[in-house]
Swiss-Prot record:
Its EC number is 6.1.1.4. This is Leucine--tRNA ligase. GO terms for cellular component: cytosol. SUPFAM superfamilies: Anticodon-binding domain of a subclass of class I aminoacyl-tRNA synthetases, Nucleotidylyl transferase, ValRS/IleRS/LeuRS editing domain. It comes from the Bacteria. It is found in: Cytoplasm. Belongs to the class-I aminoacyl-tRNA synthetase family.
């Protein structure tokens, strides 16, 4: 006997919708709980089975917390700007807005079919002007506070896509989407000064309950380094340049310097003999991505400029080279090379026959760089010193001589915030013919994205908005002509603050009401994929800290607890992808097995954080378990089984209280697979009994309800209830019922286990010894032997020594 999920699931989904069951309560007497999912990008492909894993986890918590008497905020929305919709529009001539709306409708249908308890009244969409009005408002505040500025930046320009790509969107010199060639090209860009927040972004990781590996990824991305900035003079010139080094104590070993190919001094200092070689090399580098340039495994390339610098610590002339492994956007765009003690510098020096001088004792620098520590040698006043002392002494000397100083640098770069795309938030800025740049007045926000009949790349590197002359060209009241900013914001913009808007999504006067923000922040639990570990989370933390500084939000950090679910892989343990043809569509699973089965299966696959292969047999097993529950509790006619009685049954008492305690604990700690195991154990016990107390059945159904809500609602109704199960008080357990009153005693002869007996826990030594002698197996083993000694450990064992 089985239940009909095709009838049952839509029935309860309709009930929840009609009764607005999951509308967020804001009862002042209750505690608040904010459970957040990383909102999806509504792609044309629709939901895949990886999405529901994280969504089910937050849904279990949300359903449990409602039953535990909390106000629960559990919202959903759409991160709907982005390149795929634009690419689709360029390829097909269709409107990205219409395409996006269709995708959202499909995602909504799919999500509702899975029974998630979202408050749909709070749905948001980053492409809604009433939403992006506030994204633009935040940009204006950043600009007013000196945190948004324009700069000429060498960017990843992809002619085929007609846009600039972020470093993360470039893989091996090609665009992540479509695999088109990418080139480096300087362009005017908007930047956000995230570096101003580097220390706080680092230090405040201590305030949050996040996985340590994610914190480490953020720490490495920010990349704080302490060291010194050193000034080098250029021989026969008034020019100087600075280098940053974490090891100023190795200056005596600096035998050459290297500039990034984009360094501004290269043109001035290159000698006529080297000009042609330098120009050719620079052209070659333009075709390479940052990742290719810094790949440790590749052969080193470079070219000599013909010029020399003066090493400030010993007055030596050292050649100035250019090489692609030095990046203009890191440090100063120039490095001092100490080949004896740095692997990359060593390989470069070997390749081009440059001088290698050891300044630390240890290793054999004729064979490889020595990167360990040792006393200083060949270093004048630093000789004999260990690392820490030598660094201090070197910096003191540099500062005294006025040619260097202590400095902290960061790997973190300012955030490249503009995109040469149509489908994004317009940047609310006007550039006037007299050189002034102004913001669109706040009372004129949102600056609407204009409709375009045809979206095509401008060809100049500007966004397709540059083609819309009526929109771009403006005149002020004095007849002054201006041009609107044609760059749009990156997809990261709308997702950097969306969790704030859920708190008060209809507010037209502010991002959200201050009092409500204070009640709900920080987010209690945020669940999503680890692929967003760095960028999204770093950007959201940056915006949140800025909003904290200007008094908009009351907390320093947005997300108190973060959890990353693992990836669901294809049956062959490979990542699911359209190209591999191994993507599983949740619609098909819901049709065949039901949403409750899918939810149960994904939570039972293994630990939430593990990446696990999809397995059809596992789905069958999950459905079988739900059918077992149904058969145990419901008759063929659909009424409550006779074995469910109002009589108390002490037999199941311990199993029940143990289940409530364990399941509650495991759900709280996101260990859903082991929580489900406990539900299975209870059902196995219940099958062995002639009767099951109704109150235990009700408690069981409540514990099941966050995982399999449709089946639980149906069983709750069969149990005689007329209201939804969603707000019934969560079951409690009694510790005293969990105390073991019986123990298993091991019976041994000469230290070898021969038998086991279950006895009352209170039994003393004499009774245990008597029972051991009466045991048939023991009698058999000591027959004809002399008993030398009997060892009794109450509650554990009886060991008879006999020969």
């Amino acid at each position: 006997m089985t239940f009909n999920h095709k009838k049952m699931e839509p029935k309860w989904q309709q009930y929840w919708s009609e009764h607005n069951t999951f509308k967020t309560t804001e009862d002042k007497d209750k505690e608040n709980f904010y459970a957040l999912d990383m909102f999806p990008y509504p792609s044309g492909a629709g939901l895949h089975v990886g999405h529901p894993e994280g969504y089910t986890a937050t849904d279990i918590l949300s359903r449990m917390k409602r039953m535990q008497g909390k106000n629960v905020l559990h919202p959903i929305g759409w991160d709907a700007f982005g390149l795929p919709a634009e690419q689709y529009a360029i390829d097909t001539g269709n409107d990205p807005e219409e395409f996006t709306a269709l995708n959202i409708a499909n995602f909504t249908r799919q999500i509702k079919s899975l029974g998630f308890s979202y408050d749909w009244d709070r749905e948001i969409n980053t492409t809604d002007p009433e939403y992006y009005k506030w994204t633009q408002w935040i940009f204006e505040k950043l600009y007013e506070n000196g945190l948004a500025y324009e700069a000429e930046i060498a960017v990843n320009w992809c002619p085929a896509l007609g846009t600039v790509l972020a470093n993360e969107e470039v893989i091996d010199g090609k665009s992540e989407r479509g695999g088109f060639p990418v080139f480096r090209k300087p362009m005017r860009q908007w930047m956000l000064k995230i570096t101003a927040y580097a220390d706080r972004l680092l230090d405040d990781l201590e305030l949050v309950d996040w996985p340590e590996n994610i914190k480490d990824m953020q720490r490495n991305w920010i990349g704080r380094s302490e060291g010194a900035e050193v000034t080098f003079k250029i021989k026969d010139s008034d020019e100087t340049f600075n280098v940053f080094t974490t090891r100023p104590d190795t200056l005596f070993g600096a035998t050459y310097t290297v500039f990034a190919p984009e360094h501004e001094l290269i043109e001035k200092i290159t000698t006529p003999e080297q000009k042609e070689a330098v120009e050719a090399y620079k052209k070659q580098v333009e075709l390479k991505s940052e990742l290719e340039r810094t790949d440790l495994a590749k052969d080193k390339t470079g070219v000599f400029t013909g010029a020399y610098a003066i090493n400030p610590i010993n007055g030596e002339e050292v050649p100035i080279w250019i090489a692609d492994y030095v990046l203009i956007q890191y440090g100063t765009g120039a490095i001092m090379a100490v080949p004896a003690h740095d692997e990359r510098d060593f390989e470069f020096a070997q390749q081009f026959g440059l001088n290698i001088r050891p300044v630390l004792e240890g290793g054999d620098v004729t064979k490889e760089a020595f990167t360990g520590d040792g006393p200083h040698i060949n270093s004048d006043f630093l000789n004999g010193l260990a690392k820490a002392e030598a660094i201090t002494a070197a910096i003191d000397w540099l500062e005294k001589e006025g040619i260097g100083s202590r400095k902290i640098t960061y790997r973190l770069r300012d955030w490249l915030f503009s995109r040469q795309r149509y489908w994004g938030e317009p940047i609310p800025v006007i550039h006037w013919e007299d050189g002034e740049t102004t913001l669109v007045p706040e009372d004129e926000l949102p600056l609407l994205l204009p409709k375009a009949t045809e979206i095509k790349p401008s060809g100049t590197g500007e966004s397709p908005l540059a083609n819309l002359h009526d929109w771009v060209n403006v005149t002020d009241e004095n007849g002054r002509k201006g041009r609107r900013e044609t760059n749009t914001m990156p997809q990261w913009a709308g997702s950097s603050w969306y969790f704030l808007r859920y708190i008060d999504p209809k507010n037209s006067e502010a991002i959200a009401d201050k009092e409500k923000l204070a009640e709900w922040l920080p987010v209690d639990v945020y669940i999503g994929g680890a692929e967003h570990a760095v960028l999204h989370l770093l950007y959201a933390r940056f915006w949140h800290k800025f909003l904290y500084d200007i008094g908009v939000v009351p907390t320093k950090e947005p997300f108190q607890k973060l959890f990353n679910q693992g990836m669901i892989l294809g049956e062959n343990n490979e990542k699911m992808s359209k190209s591999r043809g191994n993507v599983v569509n949740p619609d098909e699973v819901v049709e065949k097995y039901g949403a409750d089965t899918l939810r149960l299966y994904e939570m039972f696959m293994g630990p939430l954080e593990a990446s696990i292969a999809w397995n059809e047999n596992g789905l069958e097993g999950a459905r079988k378990f739900l059918d077992r529950i149904w058969r145990l509790l419901v008759t063929e006619e659909g009424t409550l089984a006779e074995k469910v009685t109002t009589d108390a049954n002490a037999n199941l008492e311990k199993a029940y209280h143990h289940m409530v305690k364990t399941v509650t604990n495991h759900y709280e700690n996101l260990r859903f697979n082991t929580g489900i195991s406990q539900l299975m154990i209870f059902i196995n016990e219940a099958y062995k009994r002639d009767t099951i107390p109704k109150q235990y059945v009700e408690g069981f159904v409540q514990l099941l309800s966050p995982i399999a809500p449709h089946l639980a609602e149906e069983l709750w109704e069969i149990l005689g209830h007329t209201e939804t199960i969603s707000y019934v008080a969560w079951p409690t357990y009694d510790e005293t019922k969990l105390v073991e009153d019986e123990v298993e005693i091991v019976l041994q002869v000469n230290g070898k286990v021969k038998s086991k007996i279950t006895v009352a826990k209170s039994l003393g030594k004499e009774e245990l010894e008597k029972l051991a002698h009466e045991d048939d197996k023991i009698k058999e083993n000591i027959d004809g032997k002399t008993i030398r000694k009997v060892i009794v450990v109450p509650g554990k064992l009886v060991n008879i020594v006999a020969n």
